[in-house]
Amino acid sequence: MSRPVPNPGILDIAPYTPGKSPAPEAGRKVFKLSANETPFGPSPKAMDAYRDAVAHLEDYPEGTSRVLRAAIGRAYGLDPDRIICGAGSDEILNLLAHTFLSHGDEAISTTHAFLVYPIATMANGATNIVAPETGYTADIDAILERVTPKTKMVWLANPNNPTGTYLPFDEIRRLRAGLPPHVLLVLDGAYSDYVSRNDYEFGIELVATTENTVLTHTFSKIHGLAALRIGWMFGPAHIVDAMNRIRGPFNVSTPAMLAAAAAIEDTAHVQMTRMHTEKWRSWLTDELTNLGLKVTPSVTNFILIHFPDARGRTASEADAFLTRRGLVLRALDNYCLPNALRMTIGTEEANRLVADGLRDFMART
């Protein structure tokens, strides 16, 4: 029997698998540490703005996210006309791919890159080219070596998810300088708010001074608005214009728009979250290293924990052990990291429970 057939390549895409979200169990507290969500929730100001917006759900949103683009512009010193907002930065990434990639094109990502990149690439008929990393960090030379006449885009998260590593901005500039002018460099700054290194830059200056670089960001992480699906991009005017031509007319809901605009102005809430993250990221790294586990140095709100390749000590066994205690981390088989788990920096209680749990796990005979 005849039936509709998906476009070529669609069925070759492995569906995205999010971190586990277990249902609470009676009599047991569950800590979800699998999706890099903030343990503090949104800013109280964002919650107030959200509640006010709910009173007007019968109205369509303002179609250009004008209020939010203005708030982002004030916060970062950007021209709002060069900002586009979306239902999470995932929508922005997919819009970029839909606008600039087609059959016969190639886009480059790295070994342990965010899985949305290859999905967006392949969904638009292009080929995903994987550049190897060095020390769980993007390797600029490896990326440049894989550029061909077919290359149209390079995806690069800085810092990277799920490794937590980053590139100094001199390396980002070197990458941009080494790419042909027609290749679009997509800098994903989802975790940039957590970085406090002197050699790190968000990327605004590079975007402002080139015609072939864009910067994406999200309100899902340090701002705690993951459920509202809200993100944004800063880019050259010609790229924003092209994307706006295919963007849905009401792609950002009013509650999301107004909550995000309030969240970005609550710098005290952001700073509190950042300080908590830095403290417990360092503590967890030390505690787990002392247990004999390897922790990749992280600048984000999560850590990458590597387990021995020995029966009784593997990542999958540790995952099952912690899950039985109500501690849910992220397995990373689909990120080519089968013997590692990613852990979100949680509350003090959650962090201590994971350290205690892994101490018990490693002490088993």
UniProtKB/Swiss-Prot annotation:
<comment type="subunit">
    <text>Homodimer.</text>
</comment>
<keyword id="KW-0368">Histidine biosynthesis</keyword>
<protein>
    <recommendedName>
        <fullName>Histidinol-phosphate aminotransferase</fullName>
        <ecNumber>2.6.1.9</ecNumber>
    </recommendedName>
</protein>
<feature type="modified residue" description="N6-(pyridoxal phosphate)lysine">
    <location>
        <position position="221"/>
    </location>
</feature>
<dbReference type="InterPro" id="IPR015422">
    <property type="entry name" value="PyrdxlP-dep_Trfase_small"/>
</dbReference>
<comment type="pathway">
    <text>Amino-acid biosynthesis; L-histidine biosynthesis; L-histidine from 5-phospho-alpha-D-ribose 1-diphosphate: step 7/9.</text>
</comment>
<dbReference type="GO" id="GO:0004400">
    <property type="term" value="F:histidinol-phosphate transaminase activity"/>
</dbReference>
<dbReference type="InterPro" id="IPR015421">
    <property type="entry name" value="PyrdxlP-dep_Trfase_major"/>
</dbReference>
<keyword id="KW-0808">Transferase</keyword>
<keyword id="KW-0032">Aminotransferase</keyword>
<dbReference type="InterPro" id="IPR015424">
    <property type="entry name" value="PyrdxlP-dep_Trfase"/>
</dbReference>
<keyword id="KW-0663">Pyridoxal phosphate</keyword>
<comment type="similarity">
    <text>Belongs to the class-II pyridoxal-phosphate-dependent aminotransferase family. Histidinol-phosphate aminotransferase subfamily.</text>
</comment>
<dbReference type="GO" id="GO:0000105">
    <property type="term" value="P:L-histidine biosynthetic process"/>
</dbReference>
<dbReference type="InterPro" id="IPR004839">
    <property type="entry name" value="Aminotransferase_I/II_large"/>
</dbReference>
<dbReference type="InterPro" id="IPR050106">
    <property type="entry name" value="HistidinolP_aminotransfase"/>
</dbReference>
<dbReference type="InterPro" id="IPR005861">
    <property type="entry name" value="HisP_aminotrans"/>
</dbReference>
<feature type="region of interest" description="Disordered">
    <location>
        <begin position="1"/>
        <end position="22"/>
    </location>
</feature>
<dbReference type="GO" id="GO:0030170">
    <property type="term" value="F:pyridoxal phosphate binding"/>
</dbReference>
<keyword id="KW-0028">Amino-acid biosynthesis</keyword>
<dbReference type="Pfam" id="PF00155">
    <property type="entry name" value="Aminotran_1_2"/>
</dbReference>
